[in-house]
C-alpha cells in the first residue's frame, strides 16, 4: 500500500524530529532526569510513546556494546564496552585496563579512578572529563592537565597501535626495451621489494632484488638481499633487529652483518628531536631509470621523465654514502655518489640515545666473513646546549676502533659537533696499522630568512685509517674497491626569497660535495636549482625552473644545464618549453601536459637537438587500487627508439581479508587495511585506494609513529552507499598492518509506515535494527520511519521496551523510495 505525502504528515514528521533532537541535546547538556512534553504529538499517539531510554541524562541501558572509541578527538578501533548500573537510572561505562592505559592519566589524578573489578574502571569522577555515548561512539574528552604528556603534536607510546598479524608482499618492476640504429637491441627487467610476516609486535622481512638483460646475460641474477626480524620496544624508545641487516650508526660507517642490533629510534621521540631523510637531486636528459644502491644493496628504483628530478622517498634510517645511477633511454649512463645528511648527534638534557650491535660481517651471498664484533655508540645530553657522544667497535682479533665527540647547540647560530675516530687493524700481509679520522658537522635553520643549511660537514682521514668494511675487504680479500678516503666536505642549503609574496616567491637550492682519496681520482658534484612562480599579462601561476649540475666521477666530467617554463591552460593542463644542455649538446623541446585526473597524468614533448635531429618523448602515470604504473617512450632521429615502464604494487592479507594495492615505498612504513562490511567500491583518502569486491582495501606508505587518518571519500561514494563513520585515526608502529572496520551499508532507501498485526503503530521512539544489531531507523509518529542501506527481502527487527517485539521484511521491489511503504510488523 502506498501512502502519499500530506502537509499534516510532513508537519508531524518535522515536530517529531525536533522532539528527538531536543531529547539528545538535553541528554548531552543536563545532569538531571529529562521529562518530555508529548502534548505536541497528536492525542491519539500520546499513550503510544517509548522514550524511556532518553529520560535520564547520559543513561545507557546496562549491557555490552560494540562501540567506536574516540579519545580527545582521536579515533580508535571498535571494542566491547560494558555498561553497568551503579544506582537507580544511572549507568557508567566500564573502562578496561587496556583502554585506561591509552588515557595516559598522570599519577596525581589516579585517585579519581574507581576500580569496580579487575577489568572494570569507573573514570567518570575525573575532574573536567566528558564521556558521551552518541551514534555508536564512546567519546571521551580529557583536559590535558590530567595527562602525562603535554605535546599536542605528538602521540605518546600508550596510544600506538601495533596492528594485526598478516602477510605482505611488495614489488617494483621496471622493464625497458631499446632499439638503437647501430648495435644490438637490449631488453632489461629489474625488480626489488619485500616479503613479510607480522606476528604480534614482531615483523619478519625478506628483501629481494633481481636483474635480467638480453644483451648482458652475465648480469642476470636474483638474490634475497637480507632476511631479518625486528620489534619496536616503546619502553626504551628503541628498535630490536635480529638477522641480516646493515649497521646504522651516526659514528661508524655502514656495513652488512648478521647478528642483533638494539638502537634508539628517534621516530618515537617528539618531532622537535627527530632527524630527516636524505634527498637526491639530479637531471635526466631523457626519460630515465634512477637506481639508488648502498654496498650493492638496491634501496630505491624508479623511472623519471626528462628534466630535473628529486628523490625524497628514502628512509631516514639510511646513513652513509649512496651510489646513484641514472640510465638514460638513449643508452647513456650517469653515475654519482651522495653523502646522506648527518646532523650533529644531539640529545635532550639528561637523556641517552644508544646503538649497540653484536654479530659477524656477511657478504651478499649470506656467508659470514671476518671476526665476531661488538659495536656500541651513545649520545648523552649533558645540559640544554651540550651533548657528549662516542662509541667503540671491537672484534675478537685484528680490528678495534673508538670514537669520541661533542656537540653544542649555539642557539641562533646553529648546531655544531666534532669527533675523532681511531682505528687499529691488520692488513692482508699481517701488517699492523692505525690511523685517525676527524669530522665536523653543522646545521642551522634561519627561520627569519626562510633559509636552511641542511648539512655542512668536513671529514679528514689519515692514509692508515680503516673503516670496518675496508678492513674486511683488505684483510680477507686483499682488495679495496672503494679507495681510501682522504678529505670530504659537503654542504646543502636552500633559501626562499620574498616568501610572503606569492607573486615573487623564489626558491634557491644549492649543493656541493667534494671527496678526494689517497689512491684514486677526486670526486665532485655541485649543483644549483632556482624555481619561481609568477604572473604576467593576466596569466597566473607561470612556473620557471633553472638547474645546473656538474659531476666528476671515476675520472669523467658531466655537465648538465636545464631550463623549464610552464604556462597553465586551466583545469590542470599546461604547455611548456625546455632547454637542456648536456656537455655542449643542446636540445629544445615543447611540451603539453594534462594533470586534470590525479589517477591519469601524462605529458608529451617534441623538439630538435643541436645536431638537427628530431626528438620526441612521452610519459604516462596511472594510479589504481591495484598498482601504480609509470610508462614512457622516447625517440631520437637516426639514433634510437626506447620504451619503458615501472609497476609498483603489493598484496596484504590478514584474518579479516586480503587485497592488492599500490606498493609501499619502504620497509619502514605502515599500512592500514580498511573493511567496509563487504561493500565494494568505497574510495578512501582521495581515492588512494578503493575497496575490492569483498569490501577490503589497503592504504600504504603511512608514516610510522605519526597520527594518520583513514578517510572515506564521502563525496565520491555511490548514491546507494551510506556510512555512520567516515574517518578513523591511529598511530601505527613501524611496519604495522592497522585494521579498521567502517559501518558501511549499501542498499535500498525507503520511507515506510509500520503497523503491528493488530493494526497498531509501534510506539514513537522504537528502534529498527538489522540482523547485526545495527540501528538503521527510528519510529516516528504514526509508525513513520526512514530506512536506508537495506536489501530487498531483508528482515529487520523493531525494538521497544528494551527487547525485540516484532520484525518486518523489506519488499521484493521498491518502485519509488519517496512513497511510503506500508509494512506489517510480525510478532516474534
From Swiss-Prot:
Subcellular localization(s) per the UniProt record: Cell outer membrane
Pfam family, one: PapC_C
Record's keyword annotation contains Transmembrane: yes
Keywords: Cell outer membrane, Fimbrium biogenesis, Membrane, Signal, Transmembrane, Transmembrane beta strand, Transport
Gene Ontology molecular functions: fimbrial usher porin activity
Bilayer disposition of the protein: Multi-pass membrane protein
GO annotation terms (biological process): pilus assembly
GO CC, alphabetical: cell outer membrane
InterPro entries assigned: Fimb_usher, Fimbrial_membr_usher_CS, FimD_plug_dom, PapC-like_C, PapC-like_C_sf, PapC_N, PapC_N_sf
Signal peptide residues on this chain, from the entry's feature table: 1-28
The protein's role, per its UniProt record: Involved in the export and assembly of PMF fimbrial subunits across the outer membrane.
Family in the record: Belongs to the fimbrial export usher family.
Protein name: Outer membrane usher protein PmfC
Organism: Proteus mirabilis (strain HI4320)
Protein's gene: pmfC
Amino acid at each position: 500500500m502506498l501512502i502519499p505525502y500530506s502537509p499534516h504528515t510532513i508537519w508531524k514528521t518535522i515536530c517529531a524530529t525536533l522532539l528527538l533532537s531536543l531529547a539528545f541535546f538535553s541528554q548531552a547538556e543536563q545532569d538531571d532526569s529529562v521529562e518530555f512534553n508529548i502534548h505536541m504529538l497528536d492525542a491519539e499517539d500520546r499513550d503510544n510513546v517509548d522514550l524511556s531510554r532518553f529520560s535520564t541524562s547520559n543513561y545507557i541501558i546496562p549491557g555490552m556494546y560494540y562501540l567506536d572509541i574516540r579519545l580527545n578527538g582521536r579515533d580508535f578501533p571498535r571494542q566491547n564496552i560494558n555498561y553497568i548500573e551503579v544506582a537507580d537510572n544511572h549507568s557508567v561505562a566500564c573502562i578496561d585496563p587496556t583502554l585506561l592505559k591509552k588515557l595516559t592519566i598522570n599519577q596525581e589524578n589516579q585517585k579519581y579512578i574507581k576500580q569496580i573489578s579487575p577489568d572494570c574502571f569507573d573514570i567518570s569522577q575525573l575532574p573536567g572529563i566528558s564521556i558521551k555515548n552518541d551514534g555508536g561512539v564512546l567519546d571521551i574528552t580529557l583536559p590535558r592537565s590530567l595527562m602525562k604528556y603535554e605535546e599536542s603534536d605528538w602521540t605518546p607510546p600508550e596510544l600506538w597501535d601495533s596492528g594485526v598479524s598478516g602477510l605482505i608482499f611488495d614489488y617494483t618492476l621496471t622493464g625497458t626495451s631499446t632499439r638503437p640504429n647501430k648495435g644490438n637491441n637490449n631488453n632489461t627487467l629489474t625488480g626489488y621489494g619485500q616479503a613479510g610476516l607480522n606476528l604480534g609486535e614482531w615483523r619478519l622481512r625478506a628483501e629481494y632484488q633481481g636483474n635480467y638483460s638480453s644483451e648482458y646475460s652475465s648480469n642476470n641474477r636474483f638474490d634475497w638481499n637480507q632476511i631479518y626480524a625486528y620489534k619496536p620496544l616503546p619502553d626504551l624508545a628503541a628498535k630490536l633487529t635480529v638477522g641480516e641487516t646493515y649497521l646504522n650508526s651516526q659514528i661508524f660507517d655502514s656495513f652488512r652483518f648478521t647478528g642483533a642490533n638494539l638502537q634508539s629510534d628517534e621516530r618515537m621521540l617528539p618531532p622537535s628531536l627527530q632527524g630527516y631523510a636524505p634527498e637526491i637531486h639530479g637531471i635526466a636528459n631523457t626519460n630515465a631509470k634512477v637506481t639508488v644502491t648502498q654496498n650493492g644493496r638496491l634501496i630505491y628504483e624508479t623511472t623519471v621523465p626528462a628534466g630535473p628530478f628529486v628523490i625524497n622517498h628514502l628512509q631516514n634510517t639510511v646513513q652513509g654514502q649512496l651510489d646513484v645511477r641514472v640510465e638514460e633511454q638513449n643508452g647513456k649512463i650517469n653515475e654519482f655518489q651522495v653523502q646522506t645528511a648527518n646532523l650533529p648527534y644531539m640529545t635532550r638534557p639528561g637523556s641517552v640515545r644508544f646503538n649497540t650491535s653484536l654479530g659477524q660481517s656477511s657478504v651478499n651471498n649470506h656467508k659470514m666473513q671476518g671476526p665476531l664484533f661488538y659495536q656500541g655508540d651513545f649520545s648523552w645530553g649533558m645540559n640544554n646546549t651540550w651533548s657528549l657522544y662516542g662509541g667503540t667497535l671491537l672484534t675478537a682479533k685484528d680490528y678495534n676502533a673508538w670514537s669520541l665527540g661533542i656537540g653544542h647547540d649555539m642557539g641562533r647560530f646553529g648546531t655544531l659537533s666534532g669527533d675523532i675516530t681511531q682505528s687499529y687493524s691488520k692488513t692482508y700481509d699481517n701488517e699492523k696499522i692505525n690511523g685517525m679520522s676527524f669530522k665536523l658537522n653543522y646545521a642551522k635553520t634561519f627561520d627569519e630568512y626562510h633559509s636552511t643549511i641542511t648539512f655542512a660537514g668536513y671529514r679528514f682521514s689519515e692514509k692508515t685509517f680503516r673503516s670496518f668494511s675496508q678492513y674486511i675487504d683488505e684483510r680477507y680479500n686483499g682488495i679495496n674497491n672503494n679507495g681510501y678516503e682522504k678529505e670530504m666536505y659537503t654542504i646543502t642549503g636552500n633559501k626562499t626569497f620574498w616568501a610572503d609574496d606569492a607573486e615573487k616567491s623564489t626558491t634557491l637550492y644549492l649543493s656541493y660535495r667534494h671527496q678526494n682519496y689517497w689512491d684514486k681520482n677526486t670526486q665532485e658534484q655541485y649543483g644549483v636549482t632556482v624555481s619561481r612562480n609568477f604572473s604576467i599579462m593576466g596569466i597566473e601561476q607561470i612556473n620557471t625552473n633553472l638547474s645546473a649540475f656538474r659531476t666528476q666521477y671515476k675520472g669523467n666530467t658531466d655537465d648538465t644545464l636545464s631550463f623549464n617554463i610552464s604556462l597553465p591552460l586551466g583545469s590542470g593542463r599546461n604547455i611548456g618549453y625546455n632547454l637542456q644542455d648536456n656537455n655542449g649538446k643542446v636540445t629544445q623541446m615543447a611540451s603539453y601536459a594534462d594533470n586534470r585526473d590525479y589517477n591519469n597524468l601524462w605529458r608529451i614533448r617534441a623538439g630538435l637537438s643541436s645536431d638537427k635531429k628530431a626528438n620526441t618523448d612521452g610519459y604516462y602515470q596511472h594510479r589504481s587500487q591495484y598498482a601504480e604504473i609509470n610508462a614512457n617512450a622516447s625517440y631520437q632521429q637516426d639514433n634510437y627508439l626506447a620504451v619503458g615502464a615501472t609497476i609498483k604494487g603489493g598484496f596484504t592479507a590478514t584474518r579479516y581479508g586480503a587485497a592488492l594495492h599500490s606498493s609501499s615505498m619502504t620497509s619502514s612504513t605502515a599500512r592500514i587495511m580498511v573493511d567496509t562490511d563487504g561493500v565494494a567500491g568505497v574510495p578512501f583518502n582521495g581515492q588512494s585506494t578503493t575497496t575490492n569486491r569483498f569490501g577490503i582495501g589497503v592504504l600504504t606508505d603511512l608514516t610510522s609513529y605519526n597520527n594518520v587518518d583513514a578517510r572515506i571519500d564521502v563525496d565520491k561514494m555511490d548514491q546507494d552507499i551510506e556510512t555512520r563513520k567516515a574517518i578513523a585515526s591511529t598511530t601505527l608502529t613501524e611496519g604495522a598492518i592497522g585494521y579498521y572496520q567502517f559501518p558501511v551499508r549499501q542498499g535500498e532507501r525507503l520511507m515506510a509506515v509500520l503497523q503491528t498485526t493488530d493494526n497498531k503503530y509501534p510506539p514513537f521512539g522504537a528502534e529498527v535494527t538489522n540482523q547485526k544489531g545495527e540501528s538503521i531507523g527510528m519510529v516516528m509518529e504514526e509508525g513513520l520511519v526512514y530506512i536506508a542501506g537495506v536489501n530487498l527481502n531483508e528482515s529487520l527487527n523493531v525494538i521497544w521496551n528494551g527487547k525485540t517485539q516484532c520484525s518486518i521484511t523489506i519488499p521484493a521491489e521498491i518502485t519509488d523510495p519517496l512513497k511510503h511503504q506500508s509494512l506489517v510488523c510480525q510478532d516474534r
